[in-house]
Amino acid sequence: MASAGTQHYSIGLRQKNSFKQSGPSGTVPATPPEKPSEGRVWPQAHQQVKPIWKLEKKQVETLSAGLGPGLLGVPPQPAYFFCPSTLCSSGTTAVIAGHSSSCYLHSLPDLFNSTLLYRRSSYRQKPYQQLESFCLRSSPSEKSPFSLPQKSLPVSLTANKATSSMVFSMAQPMASSSTEPYLCLAAAGENPSGKSLASAISGKIPSPLSSSYKPMLNNNSFMWPNSTPVPLLQTTQGLKPVSPPKIQPVSWHHSGGTGDCAPQPVDHKVPKSIGTVPADASAHIALSTASSHDTSTTSVASSWYNRNNLAMRAEPLSCALDDSSDSQDPTKEIRFTEAVRKLTARGFEKMPRQGCQLEQSSFLNPSFQWNVLNRSRRWKPPAVNQQFPQEDAGSVRRVLPGASDTLGLDNTVFCTKRISIHLLASHASGLNHNPACESVIDSSAFGEGKAPGPPFPQTLGIANVATRLSSIQLGQSEKERPEEARELDSSDRDISSATDLQPDQAETEDTEEELVDGLEDCCSRDENEEEEGDSECSSLSAVSPSESVAMISRSCMEILTKPLSNHEKVVRPALIYSLFPNVPPTIYFGTRDERVEKLPWEQRKLLRWKMSTVTPNIVKQTIGRSHFKISKRNDDWLGCWGHHMKSPSFRSIREHQKLNHFPGSFQIGRKDRLWRNLSRMQSRFGKKEFSFFPQSFILPQDAKLLRKAWESSSRQKWIVKPPASARGIGIQVIHKWSQLPKRRPLLVQRYLHKPYLISGSKFDLRIYVYVTSYDPLRIYLFSDGLVRFASCKYSPSMKSLGNKFMHLTNYSVNKKNAEYQANADEMACQGHKWALKALWNYLSQKGVNSDAIWEKIKDVVVKTIISSEPYVTSLLKMYVRRPYSCHELFGFDIMLDENLKPWVLEVNISPSLHSSSPLDISIKGQMIRDLLNLAGFVLPNAEDIISSPSSCSSSTTSLPTSPGDKCRMAPEHVTAQKMKKAYYLTQKIPDQDFYASVLDVLTPDDVRILVEMEDEFSRRGQFERIFPSHISSRYLRFFEQPRYFNILTTQWEQKYHGNKLKGVDLLRSWCYKGFHMGVVSDSAPVWSLPTSLLTISKDDVILNAFSKSETSKLGKQSSCEVSLLLSEDGTTPKSKKTQAGLSPYPQKPSSSKDSEDTSKEPSLSTQTLPVIKCSGQTSRLSASSTFQSISDSLLAVSP
């Protein structure tokens, strides 16, 4: 249609099935060829009300833009049909015009006031398809002589807010032949008195219309077609441009759950002004305040089969076409589909399907709305020349004849099945959920020479087939911001429950828009932004904030499973409660088949998320299901998924906030830094432990070393990579020195020329690694991943080195290959992308031990993360207020050689979460949901958000405070914790038995860290923790500096990995007392130095090393075994009696050689504790200075 750029029609239907069949199905009663006079026809037309339009053609086909009438062999015979204004229940009319070189419109009396001009040229046959349209009518003030512009037709449409209409989707039989080159437009229905009406069609038209054909009414409602595309045939000559009259757009509501169309109730309020302005288009729609009562209702309905002939009510909206010089642009058109989608307002009324009625109240719940909105949905930005798998042959490619702009948008699909489309409000004042919004739609024509595709298969019922429309290119009218950021904001405001009115009102008053790019302003652009360009989130800025785009690729049609109704969804609590008492719960993130309950308003208002331009859609959908809102401020948000920042910028993150990056993680995220760190570890610990990374050289500094290695292996292939690139950009495979790029930083790496092949193709693995903490280090590995194949079979020949489809496995590269095959089944071993679990099944069938490969992958992942640990940990202590504030997802690219040895190729700090296939959605969707649950987002105290970060406050109305709150901890307990850490970090060569004693005494910090670890483990989902583990003690030697909490967690795992319940019960007993929060009474025992260290053999008096005041207390004790130790079961253990001078850990005699050796070690490992000997020999320390000296010695090395 002229206003939409795609094929649309309007079909009116009464609620009762009262239409009579006037003749055989598919036929039109013959009418006399007389031409009624204008004066007789128009008054007669106004007497008709609520008829049905009939398109009597079984097969209708469009004409390619590049083809003329002579090429098809059938001369065009256009037919014009004038339908009275009463054809629609609200007096709605439309104007549709085509193009023909032999036909001209000279005068159309009162066209925009009362009639529908319809013109159709049929050259070929095409099975009927889905029929969707709307009715157009202008206000009486716009009566003027009308003539068509050269290649565009202004469309007028106005609506009265006080009027509503009953609009239905229906299907009609269509008959056509090559000798019947006209389209019959009929109407049937009832007037208020119930009488059947006849059609009256007339007007002043050119001679080609003065034929014997006169369309008549046809009451036959036997068949219901899916779609009938009727494109706008553009006039090329003889037509004079005219200023477009004022119109009003239509409102189209989707239920979102089943694809059924459900317009709004009659009593729904209409915004006073909503405008849609096509930039540089043939007609402009601007804001209108039309309040004239003499207006008509505009309605739209999607064609779907309604067995019960149930009515749907469409709401009226107001809009106006604005006069513009751009209206003469012959290459632009108004896109109807996008206009009605953008202007849809709140309120969903679920229509029954298959005899099931869904209560409207379910849609008043924003949580349910979000589940419906996000279930099985992938948001796609506007795409140009987007290619889809070749096997999708069922698409309908509609071409607009005469189109001159060839943007090639015919392959993109607008999917409406199970998609909730609603208005994104950009103004949130008051309780009106339909604020005025103004946006621009940049319309584009289809490409020339595109032949219509095969007909749409009709194997499913019409109610189950998603509407397939042409793609829409959106323009920008304001600052570029992500579309789904605004959708998160509008989801809860568009649909609200009456019982939650006051909270929602408060939310509306608090304008929740996307934040100003505060974090992104300080992003390190030269750091690794791996695969951000491959993600759909990087292109979200192409959409203005008031536009909610429901564009997804055709593959979504294959993965849209039957949605669960509200009562079928699993209801989940909003919070995950801890395993331990006095520990705050974490926010729950659900799947698309779950409905997350709402928190009370006082807590729900704290759910704020900072949106970034690179926040993936799949993250937005997941947080939206948990009722997060977009924060406008920089201090009240809880989470952000954005760019990596420079390290000093992490100071701006407050204690209750989480960012998805660690400072310094680019140490493994950049290819050059990764090689430097791994080569350093290799030189320190040997190639046996660190030989999983191909030999690399960093140019220009390693040019001489590269030249030497190059000459030693003449037949060696080398792969050249930019140090901070992604998606295969700039990667080359070379074998000649002359092919090496000069004068720019590069990483030159030995090419793995003998990879493991499957069906002759090489592949790599995308492994998802999640780090929740660096101190203590906690690493998780997602159980599934992706297997990415090269799209050409591998050949070791030197002649094939330039073929990227053979040597590179990046999806961004291989998707451009015409031979690339997608895979829709996550368990199938087909196509060029598999699930990781499918690979393990494949290898198991080949007799390969996949478990052994998985264990090797775990090993290389842990070692790679440890190589970055010293940098990240030091930056965390320097710039991050609280370890809670950072977490990060890494994407490891691993390749298997012919011996199935895993090799780390690179590490991505921002792995692509773009979901372009059912396989991607299944794996990445589950992974993100489990990741966010594992992250443990905690609701802060409302006072903490407002108050200064350094203040320590509590609230009786908020959730329990963080376990890390040390405001109530006494100074002696803080001192004891530091001394214990120093005690276990000052040993040069500790053994396993010595480290095992760390669990004999638990401090408040110990309990807090172990509680966090066990709570986190219980939320792991499909993640597997690979560090710490019961075998991770072997990795402790790889740390540049020993970390006390790594020792603690590793020993805990070794002791309790086989009996988790026992360890959890022990921690629960201490949490019940509040010990993990530093709540220790005066009588509670605290940690002290082991008795074997400070035992005086003469009197067996155990000296406590806290302070002199503690010494006086010990002197008053009558017992010689009075060490204030806290054992695992909460009792005071018996001290271990050892000989004087013996230590529970191995000691080396002091020597100058030892001093030289230890001077090279980290500072924390250079000191040894003094040993006291009081058996008459000379003591290393005198008794009078023992206590203070030991205390100073320990605290001096305490981290």
Curated annotation (Swiss-Prot):
Domain notes: The flexible c-MTBD (cationic microtubule binding domain) region mediates binding to microtubules. It is positively charged and becomes ordered when bound to microtubules: it interacts with a negatively charged patch on tubulin. The presence of positive charges in the c-MTBD region is essential for proper binding.
Record's keyword annotation contains Metal-binding: yes
Protein's job: Monoglutamylase which modifies both tubulin and non-tubulin proteins, adding a single glutamate on the gamma-carboxyl group of specific glutamate residues of target proteins. Involved in the side-chain initiation step of the polyglutamylation reaction but not in the elongation step. Preferentially modifies beta-tail tubulin over the alpha-tubulin. Monoglutamylates nucleosome assembly proteins NAP1L1 and NAP1L4. Monoglutamylates nucleotidyltransferase CGAS, leading to inhibition of CGAS catalytic activity, thereby preventing antiviral defense function.
Domain (TTL): residue spans on this chain: 604-947
Residues bound to Mg(2+) 1: 893, 906
Catalytic reaction list: L-glutamyl-[protein] + L-glutamate + ATP = gamma-L-glutamyl-L-glutamyl-[protein] + ADP + phosphate + H(+)
Similarity comment: Belongs to the tubulin--tyrosine ligase family.
Protein name listed in UniProt: Tubulin monoglutamylase TTLL4
Biased composition annotated in UniProt, kind: Acidic residues: 506-517
Lineage: Eukaryota, Metazoa, Chordata, Craniata, Vertebrata
Gene behind this protein: TTLL4
Stretches for region c-MTBD region: 918-1029
List of residues binding a protein: 727
Pfam families: TTL (PF03133)
InterPro entries named among the record's database cross-references: TTL/TTLL_fam
Phosphoserine: modified positions: 691
Protein location: Cytoplasm; Cell projection, Cilium; Cytoplasm, Cytoskeleton, Cilium basal body
GO CC terms of this entry: 9+0 non-motile cilium; ciliary basal body; cytosol; microtubule
UniProt-recorded Gene Ontology molecular function terms: ATP binding; metal ion binding; protein-glutamic acid ligase activity; protein-glutamic acid ligase activity, initiating; tubulin binding; tubulin-glutamic acid ligase activity
